[in-house]
Amino acid sequence: MPAAGKMVQIYVNANQAYQTIDGFGVNINSKQWQPRLLPAMELLLDDLGATLYRLDIFGKSNWPDPAGTIGTASLDLARMDAIYRGDIACRGWEMMRYLNKRGIEPYLTASGDVPTWMLAPDGKTLVDYERFSEMMVSLVDWAIHREGLKIRCFGPLNETDIGSPEGPSVTPEEYPKILEILDRKLTEKGINIPLVVPEQSQFNGNTICLIAAHPSLVKRIGVFATHCYADISLAQFDEVRAAASPFPDAHLWMGEYGDLDQSGEKEWYVAWVMTLRLLDMLENGYHGALVWDAYDNYHDHDEHWTIYGLLRTGLRAYTPKKRYHASKQVFRFVRPGFQRLLAEVSMPEVRALAFASPDQTQVVLIGVNQSSQPRNLNIWLEGFPEVVTRGKMAYYRTSESENCHRIAEIPVRGGNWPFSGIDVLVPGDSIFTLNFEG
């Protein structure tokens, strides 16, 4: 006979707010842009609810001189014009134009190896900061001034702590020097775009704290972004927050997160751990997070086909995986501009986070039941307007056998104590969302 479960009390206080959410989204490869990709884009936008798109056009940062044989002459304006009018670049411009039409300003990024003549004799370490910055600024300048695209922010470097093939090697001490040159060259072009940095592989504050020691960069840095493919400790989160604190207006994003399983045989496990990691980020003050990857595809930077995508890529179709449905439990309902609120849970095996719109007429709870047994939740909402307390919550759930299924509508106020709040039964090992729908 199934277990009856235990009662778990959850208290949400509308008067105690934390960070504002910038959004959730995906890393996306624009080389795949073609008409048959449109159904996948529509899924990401209209069903998943992704609003952040970290878009890489070339896959490598050596686009002026892939073979490294031309040298500095490869940055000649005529040559760069030809590259930016070429097929690969045009796929990027068209994907961004499509996103702009859908109300999205993408996060333009660059990753992978740079031209070899920009490197030290070791063939790994970036040393020609001036020409590297010239190359990066030319990309942003073309996108904004020649293509007329709206771009939210720009990320010039990727995982410089591990280097090739993810990007050139740059020490934490040298990183701010590159940013100062980029800032100068962007300013000379009249480009007031925020930078996203440092996008490091290792989760620590080593590079962030050195960037934040340069007050001249405070107006240029819009986001401090980190990467996550494993569980992160509270001490690590504390370190990153402390490192970023001198730049209070720079938000924290997880520029890449997911799991590195490539077997394709652990999809429910991957969906589960990705959700727990996302909750960790949000509990620790992150304003946004982007899954690696939007869909299964070939990546130029490491020259491999990968299956990290939320969507499985088929011959003529893109199919949502379990990790897509788990992500949807958060992405679709917690919208940009929502604030995280205090949510206290009486048992540690149930995790719950609460979010509300600025006027608090929309409220969302997301969580997981980490127990293998069902739990009876009673959720009390304190300090919300009457339009909420007299309304109902839609209950959505993802489990090993469910895919963000709509389970029920539940009144915000119950009949009597101890069932006076939102009264919901959550099975073991499941992800749940309660979304106010009037």
Place the predicted regions along the sequence by residue.
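Noncatalytic carbohydrate-binding groove/subsite architecture in carbohydrate-active enzymes
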Residues: 141, 168-275, 284
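Carbohydrate-binding surface patches
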Residues: 346-386, 429
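N-terminal module-boundary/linker segments of secreted carbohydrate-active enzymes
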Residues: 1-43
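Structural recognition of the beta-strand scaffold that forms the well-ordered cores
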Residues: 20-28, 49-59, 105-110, 152-156, ...
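C-terminal beta-strand-rich structural cap/linker in extracellular carbohydrate-active enzymes
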Residues: 413-438
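Solvent-exposed beta-hairpin/edge-strand motifs
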Residues: 382-405
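Substrate-binding cleft and catalytic face of glycoside hydrolase catalytic domains
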Residues: 11-15, 47-217
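Aromatic/acidic polysaccharide-binding cleft in carbohydrate-active enzymes
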Residues: 251-329, 341-348
